[in-house]
């Protein structure tokens, strides 16, 4: 297999860099700093001598400032997967030797090669791209001729003009790295908006061999045995038995496309923070690689918790107490908010209504989903909002909860993310860790679909949290006002399986043709209905207080 790839805006990412250079070099004023690359280009072209300004800016970005360009998320994984399968990869770029109007004569090609070298493209122990497989062309015709000469099976480019060029080889599959352009149907082009999508398109699922290669690349340890573990809704986990006879957890995170927060960065730094504050019933960090979105941790031996008991609950309370105590440490202030933190009633309502809107956007494909949302969920939600805003303490209705009443939270806390050892529970999964309202932690623990707490356990947990956070005079009132809200929120979370991004990430509809997908979606819808019924019961109890 031979795969050809364009360079600029396909491998190298310049979105932020164009705006930063435009600001520093005086092309734009600070009030335009929120522009993206396309908006910046369009703005400059409308100015006097705008096309010249745009070409000058391109020359600066691709030359003098090339070292500040980013690597496209997911590309490193893709390249390593090619290596595992012995696929030949070629970079073919339309890049002149020097930039337009560049009086300093900076070689654009030399800067591109330096950038690839600094990103370890040519390191045989890492990305392992051959230097001789990088080609620069003076014009588009020469680029297309090189693609034809190489006889690529696939070529990936962000510019449709490459594929519509008269000389483009007809047997080469065309992949446009964009979802914003269209090419006439006779050119038989496939559209993919990110490297994860291209990865899925060409390779399908990540293999154990892929993860073993990544593990060796960042640890310098060989892999004796690797096993993929059952996944939840988040990252992929692998158990690695290494050549040093130690066992590790290799966690493969979603890439950072669409400016998503790095889950790797959040989890790895959070665990390091907890370790530094003497929290021991967690995994330990080993090494991470943000280019590969790969974190390596100590493997935690033990059993999953199928049925919790009172001792488990007490250990969960103790862990929350530890987090609350270290929230007061001086270095805790440098941690960010938990993912989807809810620091006010307005935050919570806004999050739920955004989820409603996302699900409503796909109801043309799912009549049963539309009927549920329109006939059952939304009317109940509207009743809740009208009531709960009056019941919610005014101090955190619209404004954020005061910092002294916030706590550090895993934000996905429960026995589904704990391992039982002989003498203790070890808590895992800190991808969403950060500052939050302890009311959210309390309510999520009770509402999470994996918890299944009975009435007695729920009452014990609720009372323990009220006692723990008793310094907050509004904690109990806020909890009672918000509990139905959080139940409704979970009713929407279980419906994520209807969303296209979930389907793409978990490869449901494209791989299942046996009716199991429809069965699974029906099951999630039934869970959502159960949440609504439970919320109505809980809501009636709140109103009667």
Per-segment meaning from a language model:
Residues 1-53:
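Active-site neighborhood of HAD-like aspartate-dependent phosphohydrolases
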Residues 66, 70, 75-116, 134-137:
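Substrate-recognition element of Asp-dependent hydrolases with the DxDx(T/V) motif
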Residues 104-210:
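C-terminal cap/substrate-recognition subdomain and adjoining C-terminal extension
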Residues 210-222, 328-411, 475, 537, ...:
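An alpha-helical support segment within catalytic cores of ATP-dependent transferases
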Residues 227-250, 389-442:
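Active-site acidic catalytic loop and adjacent metal/ATP-binding pocket
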Residues 227-230, 234-353:
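ATP-binding pocket architecture of kinase catalytic cores
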Residues 438-473, 484-504:
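Active-site activation/catalytic loop segments of kinase-like enzymes and analogous catalytic loops
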Residues 492-545:
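ATP/Mg2+ or Mg2+-diphosphate-binding catalytic cores
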